[in-house]
From Swiss-Prot:
PROSITE patterns: DNAJ_1, DNAJ_2, ZF_CR
Subunit comment: Homodimer.
Known function: Participates actively in the response to hyperosmotic and heat shock by preventing the aggregation of stress-denatured proteins and by disaggregating proteins, also in an autonomous, DnaK-independent fashion. Unfolded proteins bind initially to DnaJ; upon interaction with the DnaJ-bound protein, DnaK hydrolyzes its bound ATP, resulting in the formation of a stable complex. GrpE releases ADP from DnaK; ATP binding to DnaK triggers the release of the substrate protein, thus completing the reaction cycle.
Domain J intervals: 5-70
Keywords assigned: Chaperone, Cytoplasm, DNA replication, Metal-binding, Repeat, Stress response, Zinc, Zinc-finger
UniProt protein name: Chaperone protein DnaJ
Main localisation: cytoplasm
Molecular function per GO: ATP binding; heat shock protein binding; unfolded protein binding; zinc ion binding
Amino acid sequence: MSKRDYYEVLGVSKDASERDIKKAYKRLAMKYHPDRTSGDKELETKFKEVKEAYEILTDAQKRQTYDQYGHAAFEQGGGGGGHGGFGGGHGDFGDVFGDVFGDIFGGGGGRRQSRQQRGSDLRYNMDLSLEEAVRGKEVEIKIPTWVGCDPCDGSGAKAGSKPKTCTTCHGAGQVQMRQGFFAVQQTCPTCQGQGQIISNPCDSCHGQGRVEKTKTLSVKIPAGVDTGDRIRLTGEGEAGMHGAPSGDLYVQVSVREHRIFVRDANNLHCEVPISFTTAGLGGEIEVPTLDGRAKLKIPSETQTGKMFRMRGKGVKSVRSGAIGDLICKVVIETPINLNERQRELLEELEESMGKDSSKNRPKEQGFFDGVKKFFDDLTK
């Protein structure tokens, strides 16, 4: 029998907030919990279904995977969280409600989170030139962080000794207290949630299982990255305490402004100045690209602001592999520092056009015709 949609199981919409999901879970878990249903197998199955849906939808990464691939992502060990993950029997009452009520009563997360407190994630800002972002590169970076302690292998205990299981919480890291009908979990005051006691702490890390150190990493920047892109290095964040998993390192990319090109997604834009004679007569010019110089044909009678698209001269997409274009906007440059002969030639050109130059300068003529009509309308 196919599984029901997790959102349907909890009775929430696909865009439900984590708070709404917890609220729905609390209501349904109380309704179907085996301690309240007298061993009804059908209701016990529903309870497991509710618990499974809750565990997937309150984990941001698992929820994203589920939204994209559905139940298939978690079958045959693909993502965890299936019915097989519950084990036999009814489980611990506090294990069910711990993560729901922990925030309310200050008890922290459920018991499975107490002993494995993952290290914090880190962020590194990577500043790149446009050329580096487009071509990709390998960068060596230095990160001040927490790393696992070598002498004690992350346990926190001195060589030759071992951490002992906490006798107060029996290794759970949390203790229960009854408040009416509910059994609420709180952090164990003896071991501070670690589930173990270190009688002989390591001299290097003083019992933490980790030490501060500047770590050197080699980061491969893929070709085509852009400002706002983020590269995740799994397990390269801070080491957790007492051998707990490390967090992740996120490299945040920022691309500096370029003096010639402006990037728009996978396209590049640039302004290319041309002489007024090239604009009028046409010709061939050289334009810059990220691969070197390229030829661009300018047709005669080109006006300033005209765009020319050079296919495949842009940026290769880091995701799809498609290559963008280079879009050149021509700007006609007015000559300066004219000598006497050059001025004479320009004057001859002006005279050759005659008084009626509308066919040579249609935009200018159209503008002044519009101005004349504007003032004529004002005086009517």
